[in-house]
């Protein structure tokens, strides 16, 4: 969902039931036209919460990933996605950090470029908040 205070927010937590449900969420940008660009970088601010859900192992970091595609239409399972590596992870609950500069591969520098944040929630309450997204 989008919230002016938080930006994009993905979570498996249902506050009315005080329960977390395992799920897979995708937050996908509108189509970007990167035709003619020789390079492009993604930067954003993000936070994880609560503190117990901050990714600090390879297994927990695998729950929070970034992807790029040029053939996404309506179904994430039918698109060809390439994982973007190099994201900086925060170390405290709800502490916003910069993702760092994440390079978009040259083969994706064309029309219909979509960037996606994929969050795989287990049965532990956790939220990923993303804001101030820039592609330059």
PLM segments and residue spans:
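Extracellular glycan-recognition surfaces and repeat-rich motifs
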Residues: 1-17
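Extracellular/periplasmic catalytic domains that process cell-envelope and extracellular macromolecules
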Residues: 2, 35, 59-60, 107-111
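Surface-exposed coil/turn segments at beta-strand junctions on protein surfaces, enriched
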Residues: 22, 35-37, 95-97, 108-110, ...
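Extracellular beta-strand-rich recognition modules
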Residues: 29, 34-52, 64, 68, ...
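Extracellular ligand-binding interfaces
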Residues: 45-86
């Amino acid at each position: 969902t989008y919230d002016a205070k938080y930006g994009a927010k993905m979570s498996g937590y249902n506050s009315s039931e005080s329960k977390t449900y395992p799920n897979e969420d995708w937050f996908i940008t509108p189509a970007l036209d990167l035709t003619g660009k020789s390079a492009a970088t993604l930067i954003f601010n993000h936070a994880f919460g609560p503190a117990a859900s901050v990714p600090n192992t390879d297994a927990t970091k695998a729950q929070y990933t970034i992807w790029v595609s040029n053939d996404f239409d309506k179904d994430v399972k039918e698109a060809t996605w390439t994982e973007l590596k190099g994201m900086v992870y925060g170390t405290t609950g709800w502490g916003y950090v910069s993702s760092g500069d994440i390079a978009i591969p040259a083969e994706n520098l064309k029309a219909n470029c979509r960037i996606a944040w994929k969050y795989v929630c287990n049965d532990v309450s956790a939220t990923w908040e993303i804001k101030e997204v820039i592609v330059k």
